[in-house]
Each structure stands twice: as structure tokens, then as C-alpha cells.
Regions:
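Recognition helix of helix-turn-helix/homeodomain-like DNA-binding domains
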Residues: 28-43
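Short polybasic/polar patches that bind polyanions
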Residues: 13, 24, 56
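Short basic helix-loop element that most often maps to the first helix and adjoining turn
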Residues: 6-21
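A detector for short, charged/polar N-terminal pre-domain segments
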Residues: 1-3
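DNA major-groove recognition helix of helix-turn-helix/homeodomain DNA-binding modules
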Residues: 27, 46-63
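Conserved hydrophobic/aromatic packing and binding residues within compact polymer-binding modules
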Residues: 8, 22-23, 33-36
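Helix-turn-helix/homeodomain-like alpha-helical modules used for DNA recognition
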Residues: 60-81
Length: 81
């Protein structure tokens, strides 16, 4: 399942992460993340996977269903923010 812009924003909000924090965790530039979140660019598959992995390490679980698209599971968090 490919991560969506909505899921990225929702996950960041659940974790109370800034774009700067997520970008650093995913190994990408903050302006790149901003462009992705604002729909100005479509991330390469490797970039989308890096973002997804960074969020999952912090306890985000992504779902295939319509709503909610992700939730926080503290038990799955490898990194606490």
C-alpha cells in the first residue's frame, strides 16, 4: 500500500511532529516534504517508503480502509517522540 498525502499529514498530526522532524527522520529535505504534503510533487517510491518507515517506527499503523487511514499504537513505537 502506497502512503497518501492525507496519511502523511494525519500521521504527523497524531505524533505532533513538525515537517522538519519528519523530514529529518525520513532522510529528506524539509522543502521536499512540504512540496509532497502540498501536492506540488509526487514522491519517488523510495521517498514515500522512507516517510512511511519513519512514521511506523514512531508507532503509526497505516490501514487500507477509508477512515481512519492511520492510528497511533504506542506498543509498536520503536522511537518515542
Amino acid at each position: 500500500m502506497r502512503i497518501t498525502v492525507s496519511q502523511i499529514r494525519q500521521a504527523r498530526a497524531l505524533l505532533r511532529m513538525s515537517q522538519e522532524q519528519l523530514a529529518k527522520a525520513a532522510g529528506i529535505a524539509r522543502p521536499t516534504l512540504s512540496e509532497i504534503e502540498n501536492g506540488k510533487t509526487v514522491p519517488h517510491e523510495s521517498t514515500a517508503e522512507a516517510i512511511r518507515a519513519a512514521l511506523e517506527r514512531r508507532g503509526i499503523v497505516f490501514m487500507d480502509s477509508e477512515r481512519p487511514t492511520c492510528y497511533f499504537d504506542e506498543a509498536k513505537a520503536e522511537i518515542h517522540t
